[in-house]
Structures are given as C-alpha cells and as structure tokens.
Amino acid sequence: EVKNIEYLAKIKINLSNNQNEEFDYLVVADGVFSKTKSIILSEEKNIEFNNSVALRGNIKNYEKEDISLYLGKDFHFVIYPVNQNKEFNFISIIKKNLKNVEISDVSLFNDDNFLKSLTNEIYNKTSVQLEGKIENIKSFPIFVSRSLKISSKKNTYFVGDALYAYPPSFAQGASQSIEASAEIFDDIKNNGNDYYNKRIKKIKLVNLRSKLNHFIFHLSNPIIVFFRNIILKILVKNKKFLELYLGKIYRN
C-alpha cells in the first residue's frame, strides 16, 4: 500500500512495509476510491454516491441471442450473451436513496433480503419473465466523481475510475480505461505531454451522454415514456444521429 510519494529526480514511493521504490513514471489505476490519487493531490476522495445500485447476475438459456436493453421507471437493465452456450450476463441500474450508514455497510449489499427487494422491484415493473432465472445475484453501490481532478506532477497519469468515474449508463467505463491506457503508452513513448488534454475532451463527451442516458432510461411519466419510446425507435435507425451521438466516442 502506498503511504507517501515524493517527486525528486525520480518518483519515490514509500510503501506500507517501509520499503521505498523509485520510478520514472507513475500510473495511478487503483479505482474510484483511489488512495494514491488522494495522496498526490493532498485532498479527500472526490466521489459521491449516485443514488443508484448496480445489480449483477447470470442467466442461462435466455430466449434472445442479441443484446437486450430494457427501460423502466427508475431502473434499466441489460442482458447480453457472454459465449455460444446460451449464457448471459444481467446488469441492472436501480435508483436507490440510501443513508450514509447504509452506504458504508458492506454487508447490506450481500444481504438476502436487500437483494430480494431489488430483484422484486424489477420483477414487478417489467413484463419480462425473469423471476427464478437470474443466478449469482450481487449488488454494489454506485459512486461517481464529483468533478474532474488531474495531476500537475511530472510523469504522473491517472487512469480509469481513478481519473474519473462515470454514471454507468453508457457502457464506457472499461473501454475508456483501455483507450486511456493506450494514450498513456503513446505519451510515454513519444515523450509527449498531451494525455490530459485528450482525456478531458473525451471525458466531457462520455459524461454528458452517460448522464443523458441515465435520465432518459429512468423516465417514469407514462406520457413522456410513450413519446420517448417512439423517438428512440426513430433515432436508432438514423445514421446521422448515431454518428453524432456515438461516432465521437468510438472514433478519435
């Protein structure tokens, strides 16, 4: 565990076992609760609970073979295949207002009654027959970054959730981490200094779309939902819209 960081001729890191290590470059990738980032920036963790809980599980022998997205009142879920053996992943984002004491209680998210309340919320609000089909169910509180904080220290790179944690409604967390890692490699290889400039632009694009998706997916007014569904059916077939909304994300 990192205890302290000094920027000398090289980057000197003091570890919890009292060992010291020196490096030319430091890549910080220890997640949304990054302690290393807090040490570098000399401030508390810049995160907040997103009033949402993620529910994950597995489904076997689901009738559809493609990726399925379902939108409901204050929740949405995705079902997608993971192999050719008709095994699927199930991921749902559910709006959930929790008290601080509940958020910090790790055991709550493994509690059978809590998990049952989450799954029942989905079962009761969708026509899709999922009851008894979802296995290995787990839940996690969702935390997002309050704001984007970068490092002015030399040869120091934040990446993944340690750099910025998005609302999970655009399926971009992992892919943005991979993309950022490639940019770090290029920056180091070419002795560049443009990593954060590129990341800031992309983070703004992804974050805006993530927040917009989250809002649209969780609409509850029946009239608004009716028109939302009609508009979405039109937009997903519109190449210009898809290029505008997705092209800037998937193409540098």
Task: Give each language-model segment a name.
Residues 3-128:
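Conserved FAD-binding catalytic core of PHBH/FMO-like flavoproteins
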Residues 27, 114, 136-217:
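Conserved mid-domain beta->alpha element of the FAD-binding
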Residues 30-31, 182, 221, 239:
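Alpha-helix N-cap/helix-start capping motif
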Residues 38, 197, 208, 246-247:
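Phosphate-coordinating loops and pocket residues in cytosolic domains that bind phosphorylated ligands
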Residues 41-44, 60, 95, 189, ...:
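A generic structural signal for secondary-structure junctions
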Residues 130-135:
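Short terminal targeting/anchoring segments
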Residues 218-228:
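A charged, well-structured terminal subsegment
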Residues 229-252:
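C-terminal auxiliary extensions adjacent to catalytic cores
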